[in-house]
Each structure stands twice: as structure tokens, then as C-alpha cells.
């Protein structure tokens, strides 16, 4: 039987559902609405395997903050009622047949990326449910990203229209432009238009930096900030080699599974 693994970026989904509520303290409503959302996702995607991946909620900002100390500094914490309700949300999802994977020190993004790539590399179909465009660097013939809330696929045509680069160049793109929401600065003075121009001429940051053909208007910026660009690229790239400690069979989904 053909495999279709659906990976839910859990907090990405929960936060969006919760933020649309008139009463942020009504976690019972959050549970109900996320269950409805997941039921629609299951109905539309027909998974054979499914899992929800949650970020760890400790104070440790992980390996990216070691490379770039300002990474995700100053982000608003999760609302306390929602934080206190996460276990109930996970229980409600478990009753639907969806297990939760909680990261321990790693960001959920890296766990999602590792699991998705391991399965896709064997030629099996993987769908990541998330609005996070960072996952687009993983795109492959059997790995796709679905923005459920905008009802769109974050596919290669979307990336070309949105950023003007190839999926495999996205970490270089963000190494140049930065990611403001994560406090990733990039090279000062290089924005999306310049990054698109550079990456249409060169494969990546290193090739551009080493080339005598790099336009003069960018040479000084590269010479002054190349190490920063390298660090920003590293934190923008997703890890795909985390030890998972379980196998795909553990994630098998059965519709209307009795729990």
C-alpha cells in the first residue's frame, strides 16, 4: 500500500486557530476548533500515517541561538491559558488517532524536516501542514507543503513567484536578506530584489563571494558581512539528521480509531 505521511506543525496550527477566537481563555473552544480543522485535513489528504510535532517550551533557544545570539530574541510568549491547555489539546488529538511528537532541545522545524526527508527519500509521499515558508527548502517530487489556512500549496511555482529563487537556494536567500520575524539580520543593505539578482547569477552565497563577477555594488557589503551571511544561512537551513528514536509504523493512522 502506498504511504502518505502527513506531518502537522502543531503550534503553527494551534496559534492560528487560537488567535481567531473572540475569547482567548476559552481553551475548550480551541480544542473543538483544532479538532474540526484536523478532521478536514484528514478528509482532504487521506493519510496512511500522521503525527503532530510540538516545539519544546523550555527557555533554551537551541543551537541556532549559539550561532546567532539574537535569534528569536524578544518573541512574545505563548498566552498562558493556551500554554496550560496544550496537554488537553494533545489528548483530544490523540483521540482522533494523531500522536504528538515533542521536541527535546531541538526546534520542531528540525524534527519535521528530519522525519519528512527520511520518508520522502524512500520515494514515499509526505505532506507538511504549515504556513511556515521555511519548509519550502525541503520541496521534492514526493514532499509537499500545504498552507491550510490560505488553501494553497507552497510549491515551486509559489517559491519562484514569492522569492524569485529555487527552493534549494532559500537558505542562501535568507542568509542575504535575513528573516525579520526571527531576528535574522542578513547582510545590511541587501533586500529581496538584490538577493534575487545575486542568486539568479550564482548558485549560493559562497559562489557569489568568491566570484570576480560579483557586481561591484555588492562587493563591499559581501566583504564586510560575509561571516554574518554565513551564520544567517546556517540558522535558516533546516536540520535533517536528528535521531528520531521511532519508526514509521508507530505513526500509522486508522480512520475513526477507537482510543
From Swiss-Prot:
InterPro entries with a match to the protein in the record: 5-3_exonucl_a-hlix_arch_N, 5-3_exonuclease, 5-3_exonuclease_C_sf, DNA_polI_H3TH, FEN, HhH2, PIN-like_dom_sf, Xni
GO biological process, one term: DNA replication, Okazaki fragment processing
Cited Pfam families: 5_3_exonuc (PF01367), 5_3_exonuc_N (PF02739)
EC nos: 3.1.-.-
Entry note: cofactor: Binds 2 Mg(2+) per subunit. Only one magnesium ion has a direct interaction with the protein, the other interactions are indirect. Binds 1 K(+) per subunit. The potassium ion strongly increases the affinity for DNA.
Sequence positions that bind K(+): 176, 187, 190
UniProt keyword annotations, A-Z: DNA-binding, Endonuclease, Hydrolase, Magnesium, Metal-binding, Nuclease, Potassium
Biological function: Has flap endonuclease activity. During DNA replication, flap endonucleases cleave the 5'-overhanging flap structure that is generated by displacement synthesis when DNA polymerase encounters the 5'-end of a downstream Okazaki fragment.
Name assigned to this protein: Flap endonuclease Xni
Species the sequence originates in: Vibrio vulnificus (strain CMCP6)
